Amino acid sequence: MLKELFVNLTILITFNYLFTHLFKERLVHKKDSISFQAVKGLACGLLGVILMVFGFTYQHSIIDLRNIPIMIAALYGGWVSTATALAMITAGRLLITMNTSALYSVIIICIAAIPSLIVSRRKKVQLKHAFYLLIITNSLISFSFYFLIDLHSYELHLYFWIISIAGGMLSLYIIDHETNAHLLFKQYKFQAHFDFLTGVYNRRKFEETTKALYQQAADTPHFQFALIYMDIDHFKTINDQYGHHEGDQVLKELGLRLKQTIRNTDPAARIGGEEFAVLLPNCSLDKAARIAERIRSTVSDAPIVLTNGDELSVTISLGAAHYPNNTEQPGSLPILADQMLYKAKETGRNRVCFSEKKE
């Protein structure tokens, strides 16, 4: 008896790791499509059937931890997942043996699912809620053991309660821990690659992308691309006059407009305080010039709304260079683009300067 319950516990723990690896951050919300909720329910239902197969028979009744998969389905999937898991577990139980005990167990497990569904409506389910659910479901199961199918073994009830509560609490702890760890990993990964303020690449990720593009240019005949540097005109004055929080708002809006103007495959980055850069792979010289002008006009034509409601007209200066039209060495593009950016600032700002130099 204790051995079979322990086997159930080890199966449960193994499933929890597989479950979190399969669904990852999708476990933190239940607003999935019905089909995806059904997939969660199928996984929990399969677990319930496996637990019954590895349970033990006591006076024509199967004793196992199938109540825990129902709780997992409700808390991390919703009503569709719960209904799917219940259907699988019910069918599995009736197929194993069809008797009075099986019918009682089906009724009890369906009733036990109701508190889990009620708790699942909470935005955040804590371990204490899981503990309360286990107390309720275990009480229902013990009631069925004792009064409906005459299982009066106090040793059986004690072992079941200990293993069930341990398994249920451990299950939710593992799922929560693994899910939070995955979300934290995603957050760290995002912070390693993206600028936290604007949502575009940071300097390090942009340099990695640029080096990869240099290598592609060296390996691919007739490959062409452009590099655009841009700088917000008089940004220091904006910070001094409106404050750094409004300066941040300008940076955010520029990042947003930049992403809306270029292709999804064009890497954009914030490489300095108010300096941005864009790579245009597989882009001709004429097309790159048009894109640069479109970026400039997108920023200058519409004022930026600050957090205090004021509208601020902002302009940018852009410098650009193209491979192979401006140079035969891809690695020299940053120097040429930076020179053109300096020229754009020196000749009046709010303009695009494209390199005409051929090295």
Curated annotation (Swiss-Prot):
<dbReference type="InterPro" id="IPR050469">
    <property type="entry name" value="Diguanylate_Cyclase"/>
</dbReference>
<feature type="transmembrane region" description="Helical">
    <location>
        <begin position="155"/>
        <end position="175"/>
    </location>
</feature>
<dbReference type="Pfam" id="PF00990">
    <property type="entry name" value="GGDEF"/>
</dbReference>
<dbReference type="GO" id="GO:1902201">
    <property type="term" value="P:negative regulation of bacterial-type flagellum-dependent cell motility"/>
</dbReference>
<dbReference type="Pfam" id="PF07694">
    <property type="entry name" value="5TM-5TMR_LYT"/>
</dbReference>
<dbReference type="InterPro" id="IPR000160">
    <property type="entry name" value="GGDEF_dom"/>
</dbReference>
<feature type="transmembrane region" description="Helical">
    <location>
        <begin position="94"/>
        <end position="114"/>
    </location>
</feature>
<dbReference type="InterPro" id="IPR029787">
    <property type="entry name" value="Nucleotide_cyclase"/>
</dbReference>
<feature type="transmembrane region" description="Helical">
    <location>
        <begin position="4"/>
        <end position="24"/>
    </location>
</feature>
<dbReference type="InterPro" id="IPR011620">
    <property type="entry name" value="Sig_transdc_His_kinase_LytS_TM"/>
</dbReference>
<dbReference type="GO" id="GO:0005886">
    <property type="term" value="C:plasma membrane"/>
</dbReference>
<keyword id="KW-1003">Cell membrane</keyword>
<protein>
    <recommendedName>
        <fullName>Uncharacterized protein YhcK</fullName>
    </recommendedName>
</protein>
<feature type="domain" description="GGDEF">
    <location>
        <begin position="223"/>
        <end position="357"/>
    </location>
</feature>
<feature type="transmembrane region" description="Helical">
    <location>
        <begin position="68"/>
        <end position="88"/>
    </location>
</feature>
<keyword id="KW-0812">Transmembrane</keyword>
<dbReference type="GO" id="GO:0043709">
    <property type="term" value="P:cell adhesion involved in single-species biofilm formation"/>
</dbReference>
<keyword id="KW-0472">Membrane</keyword>
<dbReference type="GO" id="GO:0071555">
    <property type="term" value="P:cell wall organization"/>
</dbReference>
<keyword id="KW-1133">Transmembrane helix</keyword>
<dbReference type="InterPro" id="IPR043128">
    <property type="entry name" value="Rev_trsase/Diguanyl_cyclase"/>
</dbReference>
<feature type="transmembrane region" description="Helical">
    <location>
        <begin position="129"/>
        <end position="149"/>
    </location>
</feature>
<dbReference type="GO" id="GO:0052621">
    <property type="term" value="F:diguanylate cyclase activity"/>
</dbReference>
<feature type="transmembrane region" description="Helical">
    <location>
        <begin position="36"/>
        <end position="56"/>
    </location>
</feature>
<dbReference type="GO" id="GO:0000155">
    <property type="term" value="F:phosphorelay sensor kinase activity"/>
</dbReference>
